[in-house]
Amino acid sequence: MQTDLSDSSFFNHKSVMTDEIMASLEHYPLIHNNQLKGIDATLGGGGHSYHLLRKYSDLNIIGLDQDPFARKSALKKLDEFKSRIDIRASNFADFVPKEKVSFVIADLGVNSNQLDDPKRGFSFQKDGPLDMRMNPLLDVDAEKLIEVLNEKDLANLIYKYGDERLSRKIARKIKLDLKENGKYSGTKELAYSIAGCFPPKQRYKKIHPATRTFQALRIAVNKEIEVLEKFLQVVPEWLLPGGIISVISFHSLEDRLVKSCFKNDQRLKNLTKKPITPSEEEVELNKRARSGKLRIAQLN
């Protein structure tokens, strides 16, 4: 099922740690000079770029996003800055800039539209197809993934990307369901089946028992870890001397990769020994910000 790009009424994503992102760029020695150029590697709804373009009147930004719905929404949000924003249909790991820039920002979180639109299949709060593709042109969605993987590989995936200790039991149940009943009807049926793998007392906790498995499937479908690894390898080559790279991550796998890169890449100076986290005020206003971690590095 395709997302209707003509309907942007439900795109209401709140950008995370905007103030902290803005402050991170002050490390760049020429941040207040004319002809400033930057890359928003995860444009989303355009929130971070909007605030940056408002603050720096001579700033030009290249905004990258593989999600066509996000790009359409960002175009509307950033219309007043259309002469200074260049929106590209690209995964950040595949992009090759023609010239070096002063900064790169990346927010690795799933945007609220992707979570809240049931047709995207990222969530089980409302029933939808087992999709989970950030780029609808990808060949393999979540439904296809659980079909083609054998039980062992599916269990390993759920454990590695979801840190789910019941991964083997869950994988066994999923493959048994597929064998006996064919495809799942949607996200709710899969979530219900996963919940059945847990003891009754654990099925009704604050965090739904299917949450970790859904995270693992989403990461695998979009190859998020492989893409991030490639991005971290190439992004220093995008920067001018003294340029800033600011990355917000939302789970431990991502944060470990960013931390390791910023600490060990000899091209970079690590500016955050410990990650910057959202303020209590922001978390109160936007619960989805609570697990965000911002790390900053500077090109030597």
From Swiss-Prot:
One of its GO terms (cellular component) is cytoplasm. Coiled coil: none annotated. It comes from the Bacteria. Keywords: Cytoplasm, Methyltransferase, rRNA processing, S-adenosyl-L-methionine, Transferase. Signal peptide: none annotated. The keyword Iron does not apply. It is found in: Cytoplasm. The keyword Transferase applies. Its EC number is 2.1.1.199. One of its GO terms (biological process) is rRNA base methylation. GO terms for molecular function: rRNA (cytosine-N4-)-methyltransferase activity. It catalyses: cytidine(1402) in 16S rRNA + S-adenosyl-L-methionine = N(4)-methylcytidine(1402) in 16S rRNA + S-adenosyl-L-homocysteine + H(+). S-adenosyl-L-methionine binds at G46, G47, H48, D65, F92, D107, Q114. InterPro entries: RsmH, SAM-dep_MeTrfase_MraW_recog, SAM-dependent_MTases_sf. Pfam families: Methyltransf_5. It is an enzyme of class 2 (transferase). Belongs to the methyltransferase superfamily. RsmH family. Specifically methylates the N4 position of cytidine in position 1402 (C1402) of 16S rRNA. This is Ribosomal RNA small subunit methyltransferase H. It comes from Prochlorococcus marinus (strain MIT 9301). The lineage of its organism: Bacteria, Bacillati, Cyanobacteriota, Cyanophyceae, Synechococcales. The gene is rsmH.
